[in-house]
Design a protein with these regions (language model features):
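Short beta-strand-to-coil "C-cap" segments at the C-terminal boundary of structured domains/repeats
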Residues: 192, 692-699
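Acidic/polar residues at beta-strand termini and the immediately following turn/coil
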Residues: 51, 146, 338, 416-417, ...
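Electropositive polyanion-binding surfaces
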Residues: 22, 166, 171, 176-178, ...
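Internal insertion modules embedded within essential enzymes
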Residues: 133, 181, 671, 680-695
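Charge-lined substrate channels and their catalytic hotspots, especially those that engage the 3′ end
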Residues: 1-274, 281-327, 358, 365, ...
Length: 736
């Protein structure tokens, strides 16, 4: 029943709730009490509007839009409205909304289809329930100053302080009833440590994303009740792979081994590849406490010195982990390949393995480079390792020929000592050992995805859609501006055209910067129940099957696969799992996004901490981004900082948004330029680093910026002088 439609069609507006419920009851025969509950729900979600006289109208008919508010620390904000560009909300029109709140907004002025100004009419829901901040004892009251300075200070009563001490970082649960009052209250639920200490600051970031290391008692009880050994009764109806030469290949510090491999040569120069994945679903039963907590977490979160696991260690490091010398339950994909690594056939089975060796990427790399000691140590699997290398190279060539976009971007690696001090930040590239595992897992994921697509069974796919046409055009213009010829198709339909560009810039000094520029033009990969292909891999069918210890989508599709293997009719699977895969896809995409943001912010904090040692020192860097307020420069170790506009030479600059360039009469800055910079400041609270150009004093004469977008010059937008502040780069990742 569509209540909003009934109200509109029968002109039942401006009635109070009792009168409206009675009128609707006469029309529908539904009880007045039930209708009042439904009306209240529609008021709470913003579909209906309750005015000061307690009369009800339809929000959309009044020109009100549902929106999520994003605030800037200066007080103004933006409303994200479906189907419209973001509304600009001036500070005077925020009307009690906080960052992240769901609101009703209305338009107050419209300069163009792209420039809309609005105001908050009503806050529907405050979405911030917990905050992280610094506890300060005052003479008359104790307060917490949130790390997020877009939020107000929080009053903490003595009984709600958990005996926090002055200048300690705390995690606070907000009193939601006080959110619309002049004084927001809360209670301390956890003391995180003394402010400005690395451990407390990292924990503060983790809590700000509502990430918790500990598992609840019910989940732990379930995990601890599971035997750490595989019972012989569990072998039933499983294929026995214990005689295979099975190995795992992981990092030196890894404890959770969820994939293992074995190989043998077959007729006509082909290969039989066995990829064994931990059968986590055998232990994490559907709707158990373990399952619900894994669903909530969605993924394991990895920091340089810490992991927040999706599953308790009793499973992730215990009976689910494919440890050396132990029998383990697996879900296996057996793939027959011809000599060119075309798939001849494959099958998916429940199995049991006994891992012969726990090997590391470093060991595999050294073996491939001819380390005789390691070759002798692993003599029983040496031929297999060479076989994996053959397969990987052939698979890599096949993916290249179909147009896979391969970006070899070095990742910053933060090295810390035992006391948590950051020793160095280095760039690390993926070596051949990593490529072997990557190639085998991609092949496995593709085989599994195609199987269940063809069967038309509900599934969770990993999709990467083609780039937005506007981003493709912008990228093409920027590359041409930097002298990189390209034939990018504006519809973004051919991944091979991207790969040609990447190959053309190989070996150039700005290769990494340009590759990152290409990456930023891409869509974000996500989970969905609809198979939309994977643009980056140039793959028609793709899923995540190979990491069920650390990713919920993998665990869920294991469960679906096992139900199918055990004979559950496809129609039954459709009825049961269609809604489940839809919810899980959305949830897992969100939890992955949260994990990525938390990992990035912790890394940014540690980079800022590390660079405090180098204040005043000179470095050579590459321009990695250009905005009207300044230029971003990336150092050789991957640390990025901002040279603000007032620290550029005095000039009249024109900023071109389409090519991301700042052009002056005498100076010109674009992505890929090499510059010498001085570390001017490293702000650990804001997680940002400021650079200055070597030999350039702060600009006291002023620099004009005439903003240019889509090749249409706009009026001068701002002038930098001694007294004006440049824009913050706090949200640089979202802007660029």
């Amino acid at each position: 029943m569509d209540i909003v439609k009934l109200i509109r069609e029968n002109n039942l507006i401006y009635l109070k709730i009792d009168a409206l419920a009675k009128a609707l009851s006469k029309l529908t025969g539904e009880s007045v009490i039930d209708l009042k509950n439904e009306i209240n729900s529609l008021i709470h979600d913003g579909s209906l509007f309750l005015d000061d006289e307690k009369k009800i109208s339809i929000s959309a008919d009044k020109g009100f839009f549902k929106a999520k508010i994003t605030l800037n620390r200066k007080g103004y904000g933006f409303a994200n409205v479906e189907g419209y560009p973001d509304f600009f909300i001036p500070a005077f029109a925020i009307n009690g909304a906080y960052d992240g709140d769901d609101c009703l907004v209305e338009i107050i002025s419209r300069k163009s289809d792209e420039e809309i100004e609005g105001k908050v009419v009503k806050v529907l829901r405050h979405n911030t329930t917990h905050i992280v901040g610094t506890y300060i004892e005052g003479k008359s009251k104790n307060v917490v100053f949130p790390d997020d300075d877009k939020l107000p200070q929080i009053r903490i009563l003595k009984n709600d302080s958990k005996n926090a001490k002055n200048n300690e970082k705390v995690w606070v649960e907000l009193d939601m009833d006080s959110m619309d009052s002049k004084e927001v209250r809360g209670k301390v639920v956890e003391i995180l440590g003394l402010a400005n200490t690395p451990k407390a600051e990292q924990l503060s970031i983790i809590r700000s994303y509502n990430l918790i290391e500990q598992f609840d008692p019910n989940t732990l009880k379930e995990a601890r009740s599971i035997s750490q050994t595989v019972d012989k009764s569990q072998y039933k109806n499983r294929e026995d792979f214990t005689s295979q030469r099975v190995i795992t290949i992981d990092g030196e510090d890894a404890r959770d081994f969820d994939d293992a491999i074995a190989v043998e040569r077959i007729d006509n120069g082909g290969y039989r590849l066995s990829v064994h994945i931990a059968d986590v679903s055998d232990y994490v039963k559907e709707n158990s406490y373990l399952d619900k907590e894994a669903y909530r977490r969605g993924t394991s979160v990895y920091f340089s010195n810490q992991v927040i696991p999706m599953l308790p260690k009793e499973l992730s490091n215990g009976v689910c982990s494919l440890s050396e010398g132990k029998d383990r339950l697996v879900l296996s994909v057996i793939i027959d390949l011809d000599k060119d690594c075309n798939v001849l056939k494959h099958r998916i089975v429940e199995g049991i393995i006994h891992s012969n060796h726990r090997m590391t990427y470093t060991e595999i790399k050294n073996i491939l480079e001819g380390d005789n000691f390691l070759i002798e140590k692993y003599h029983d699997v040496y031929d297999d390792i060479l076989c994996y290398q053959e397969i990987s190279k052939k698979l890599l060539m096949k993916r290249h020929s179909r147009g896979e976009i391969r970006m070899d971007i070095p990742e910053p690696y933060i090295l810390e000592n035992a006391s948590g001090e950051i020793v160095s930040i280095e760039k690390r590239v993926q070596d051949e050992a990593h490529e072997i595992i990557e190639s085998l897992m991609i092949l496995t994921n593709e085989c599994v995805a195609k199987t269940y697509f063809d069967l038309k069974i509900p599934f969770v796919y990993r999709v990467h859609e083609k780039p937005d046409s506007e981003k493709v055009l912008r990228l093409s213009n920027m590359l041409k501006n930097m002298g990189v010829a390209n034939q990018l198709q504006i519809d973004g339909d051919v991944p091979a055209s991207y790969q040609k560009i990447i190959e053309s810039i190989k070996g150039k000094t700005n290769e990494t910067t340009l590759t990152k520029l290409i990456l930023r033009s891409m869509m974000k990969a996500r989970y969905t129940p609809t198979c939309l292909g994977h643009f980056g891999l140039a793959s028609e069918y793709y899923c995540h099957f190979t990491s069920p210890i650390r990713r919920y989508p993998d665990l869920l599709i294991h469960r679906i696969i096992k139900n199918h293997l055990r004979g559950v009719p496809i129609q039954n699977l459709k009825l049961k799992y269609t809604p489940i895969v839809a919810r899980a896809s959305e949830q897992s995409s969100e939890t992955e996004k949260t994990a990525d943001e938390a990992e990035r912010e912790v890394d940014d904090y540690k980079k800022a901490v590390y660079m405090t040692k180098f204040i005043g020192e000179q470095f050579v860097g590459t321009v990695s981004g250009v905005q009207e307020f300044g230029i971003f420069v990336e150092l050789e170790n991957g640390v990025e900082g901002l040279v603000r506009l007032e620290y550029l030479p005095s000039d009249e600059y024109e900023y071109d948004d389409m090519s991301m360039t700042l052009k002056g009469n005498n100076h010109h800055y674009t992505i890929g330029d090499t510059l010498k910079v001085i570390v001017a400041n490293a702000n650990t609270k804001l997680r940002q680093i400021d650079f200055e150009l070597v030999g350039v004093e702060k600009n006291t004469l002023g620099s004009f910026v005439i903003k240019k977008k889509d090749n249409r010059t706009k009026k001068q937008t701002r002038k930098i002088s001694k007294t004006t502040k440049s824009k913050s780069n706090k949200n640089k990742r979202k802007k660029r």
